[in-house]
Every structure is written in structure tokens, then in C-alpha cells.
């Protein structure tokens, strides 16, 4: 049984003017779909054929199967990291944890932005919660993912060129500025306070097999 491309949690034009309808159509319908389709082909006949995609990224060797599984998960998580009428700052325990780790929310934004704009080549930048409860800003190159480790992703920014080239050409820094106007802190707060069991973690990358009843997604606004 193969996996389906998850639907966007909002309309294609919902993130304008910061992210265009054309970008979402290409990014979701072409790039994300290609990773899901390739993953479905590569998993056939392997020992992971009946495994959840989250299990695959934790246990598969680095290579084509891992890369496409990770990229499928990363993109699913990224769509929920954004939302219309979002931006601003988080609240409550997450904001307190960010201030504890970075000194202030503005210092956190500066550090995250520098890591996103400065990442060499393609990849992702994540805010993660470590097993000890502390927060880190993590860069992952190409198709790598923190879902393969023990830290829990809270929110992420895709810095592959296909995420921003239609709207911002080669100006990645300007794209990162726009990211902050779309950042879905309610989603990040839910991830920060959620339990660590497999069922709760699976809701953060809602890829479902065809015919499977989907989990209720996190709010995107």
C-alpha cells in the first residue's frame, strides 16, 4: 500500500504576498509529490514495505530510500510550519524556552535567520527540542532530517532553491525574512508541549497510506 501526497493545510494563495500561489503549486504539486512518488517506488520489496514512514527515516541506511522518505516528511512538516495570519512570536512555555536558550526572541530570530541564509547548498533549518528539554537551532543538509534522531522538531524553514526562487530569485535572505511573517507558532507550541510517544510524534509529519484515516492535523492559523 503506497503513501499519498498530503494536501496543503490551506489554499494555494493563502500565503500571499509572502509566498505566491505559483510557488506553492510547483513546490507542493511537483517537488513534494516527486519525493512521495519516488519513496513509494523505492520502498517496494524492502523490509520497510509495511513500515510507517517515520520508522523508515530512523532505521534505513543513508541513501535513496532514506533521502526520499526524509524529504517527504520534511515537506509535510514544513507546510504546517507556515500559515496565513501567522508570524509574530510564540507564547507561554515555548517563548520562555527560546529566551532561556537564546537570551531573547530577537536573538533567536537573528541566529535562526543567519543559519538559514548562510547554509551552504540546499537543506533545512529547524528549531528542535532536545530530550533534556532544551532547544537548539539545527541545520540539516540536502535531505537529512532531525526525525531520524531523538530531538523533536518544532518548526522548520526549507532553504532549497525551489522553495524561494520563483518569488525571490537568488535572495535567500529576503525569503527568510518572509518566513517570519508566516511562521506558525501555534503549531510549534503544540509540538513543544506534546508527549514524545510515537502516535503524537506521527501527527507532525502527516503522511498517510492510501485508504488510511488521517490524523487530525495541527492548526495552521
Task: Describe these PLM feature segments.
Residues 1-221:
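Feature for soluble, non-membrane regions of globular proteins
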Amino acid at each position: 500500500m503506497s503513501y499519498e501526497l498530503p494536501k496543503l493545510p490551506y489554499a494555494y494563495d493563502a500565503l500571499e504576498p509572502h509566498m505566491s500561489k505559483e510557488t506553492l503549486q510547483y513546490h507542493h504539486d511537483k517537488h513534494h509529490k516527486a519525493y512521495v512518488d519516488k519513496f513509494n517506488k523505492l520502498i517496494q520489496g524492502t523490509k520497510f514495505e509495511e513500515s510507517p514512514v517515520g520508522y523508515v527515516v530512523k532505521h534505513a541506511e543513508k541513501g535513496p530510500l532514506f533521502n526520499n522518505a526524509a524529504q517527504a516528511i520534511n515537506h509535510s512538516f514544513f507546510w504546517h510550519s507556515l500559515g496565513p495570519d501567522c508570524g509574530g512570536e510564540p507564547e507561554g512555555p515555548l517563548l520562555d524556552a527560546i529566551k532561556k536558550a537564546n537570551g531573547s526572541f530577537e536573538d533567536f530570530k537573528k541566529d535562526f535567520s543567519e543559519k538559514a541564509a548562510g547554509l551552504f547548498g540546499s537543506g533545512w533549518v529547524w528549531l528542535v527540542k532536545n530530550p533534556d528539554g532544551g532547544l537548539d537551532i539545527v541545520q540539516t543538509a540536502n535531505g537529512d532530517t532531525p526525525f531520524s534522531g531523538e530531538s523533536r522538531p518544532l518548526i522548520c524553514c526549507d532553504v532549497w532553491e525551489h522553495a524561494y526562487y520563483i518569488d525571490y530569485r537568488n535572495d535567500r535572505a529576503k525569503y527568510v525574512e518572509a518566513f517570519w511573517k508566516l511562521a506558525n507558532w501555534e503549531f510549534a507550541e503544540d509540538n513543544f508541549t506534546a508527549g514524545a510517544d510515537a502516535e503524537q510524534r506521527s501527527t507532525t509529519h502527516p503522511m498517510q497510506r492510501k485508504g488510511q484515516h488521517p490524523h487530525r492535523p495541527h492548526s495552521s492559523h
